[in-house]
Swiss-Prot record:
This is rRNA methyltransferase 2, mitochondrial. Its main location: mitochondrion. It holds the Pfam family FtsJ. SUPFAM superfamilies: S-adenosyl-L-methionine-dependent methyltransferases (SSF53335). One of its GO terms (cellular component) is mitochondrion. Its EC number is 2.1.1.-.
Length: 250
């Protein structure tokens, strides 16, 4: 099965227009002939405050606010940190990571970090980040490329917003996203600095408690988090693991 990793955000045409220096929402037009799901998507986008905030703050996707909330609460990103991000397209988490770690060097008096972002999809460059587009993180070649790019640096935070293409078969989809989490965990164990952090996306299912227990073997704390920016009807949660203890099982 071929997995497509993405930050769960699709590129859609903006539904806003500039009037008198301020932005006003447009109502969806020409809905006749569109599918019901397309009409529902347009209506939901117009009613979603995070879509508007993302546009106003120049984030590529509303999902930026999920990471912002996690970082505001748990302090996982700091200036000078080295960050690895998996499932990075279209780049909104990358934008946040660059800002919070000062990877773009805009904070003159703060240490400059580094951000490495990978996704199976190609996506536009983010200033301050090293992008690996069109690469399958689970492949040995991709992980070799990441190690080469990191050189001798250890990672202070690993982020994963990866999700497989949903098949509609619940058990298969749950197994697929759990397998992705373990793939990220294994890489994090090999590449993380002491006291590093890890964030992975999960879909609520019976495999999550075991994953939490396995993460607790290597991190001091693990919390299950659903940011306010996650849609209410979404099954997604994030496991936030803090303070890496080392790869040796304790």
């Amino acid at each position: 099965m071929r997995l497509v990793f993405t930050g769960n955000c699709v590129f859609k045409r903006l539904l806003h227009t500039e009037i008198g220096g301020k932005y006003a929402k447009q109502q969806p037009r020409n809905l006749k002939g569109r599918s019901k799901s397309s009409q529902e998507w347009l209506t939901r986008q117009l009613a979603d405050p995070y879509v508007e905030k993302a546009r106003m703050m120049n984030y590529r996707c509303r999902s930026a606010f999920k990471l912002l909330e996690i970082d505001d609460k748990y302090g996982i990103l700091r200036p000078g940190d080295t960050v690895l991000e998996c499932g990075a397209a279209p780049g909104s988490w990358t934008q946040v990571a660059v800002e919070r770690t000062n990877a773009n060097g805009k904070q003159e008096r703060a240490p400059q970090g580094a951000v490495f972002s990978i996704d199976l999809l190609h996506f536009h460059a983010v200033p301050g980040a090293t992008i690996f587009g069109g690469m399958d993180f689970t492949s040995s070649l991709a992980q070799k490329r990441l190690r080469e790019a990191l050189q001798d640096r250890k990672v202070n935070c690993v982020l994963s917003d990866m999700a497989p293409n949903a098949t509609g078969v619940r058990m298969l989809d749950q197994e697929s996203i759990t397998n992705l989490c373990y793939e990220v965990l294994r890489f994090a164990l090999a590449m993380s600095a002491p006291q590093a952090h890890l964030v992975v996306k999960v879909w609520d299912n019976g495999d999550v408690p075991k994953l939490e227990r396995d993460m607790l073997r290597f991190y001091e704390k693990v919390k299950r988090v659903k940011p306010r920016a996650s849609r209410g009807d979404s099954a997604e949660h994030f496991l936030v693991a803090r303070n890496f203890k080392g790869a040796t099982d304790s």
